Amino acid sequence: NRIWQWHFGKGLVETANDFGKMGQLPSHPRLLDWLATGFAADGWKVKNLHRLIMHSNTYRQSSRFGKKDHLTRDPDNRLLWRMNRRRLEAEALWDAVHLSSGTLNATLGGPPVVPPLAADEIASLREKWHWVVSADPAQHTRRGLYILVRRNFKFPMFDVFDTPVNSVSCPTRDVTTVAPQALWGLNNESVFRQAVQLAGRVVKEAGSEAPAQIGHVWKIALGRSPTSREASSALKLLEELERQATARLPDAPQAVTNRGQALAKLCLAVFNLSEFAFVD
């Protein structure tokens, strides 16, 4: 039930911590029984269950509305007549940014890591001595799963994107939409660094032609080619940013050209698209 919840935003039983009389009834009881018995018979292999769910027609549905009567008959989508649009968790969003830029360190296991914070994030900490940055720079881009979590202190980016307090049970994470989330994507130095890295990757893999660069950014970050309208708008934006490229992005090498600066800003804009942060 909880693995189903991770993929669909809601479990087959919505009260994930309560299967008793006070909890809700399952929306698909026979499906829940079938998944549970199959999971046990398969040796409790979580990856196989993920694969089974993600290959299903139900998971691969669009989140767009179908027939008008669907909304009338099942407004909460409990019967799963469409996909629930779901925002990535904080850790997954961190991973997505670094995977797109090509800097994600996918090493498994080991102790918690402590990535560097921006100056304003450090200034906001009450107990700054808790955040001792890992000495090895290669550790700074580990998966979000490995970032240090303390009971009384959370990684600021995770705090902004609704990571729960780890001192109490949390059956379902809250999903908020607040201004600090947009400000993190637009202004945080770590996102700037990854935008610069993505721009460098695109130049290396797609060459120097702007249309090819734009198409490659879309394929890396969004998993698809841009529409003709998106490609046209992105090309105009890239040309305008190149003309205006005077202020340098943080951590951009001095050798980066105006085109490189403009491309990095375009990559930053793509990181901030709703489509990048949501499973649709």
Model-derived segments and spans:
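Active-site Gly/Thr loop motif
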Residues: 143, 150-162
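Primarily short, surface-exposed interaction patches in extracytoplasmic proteins
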Residues: 1-139, 158, 164-173, 186-262, ...
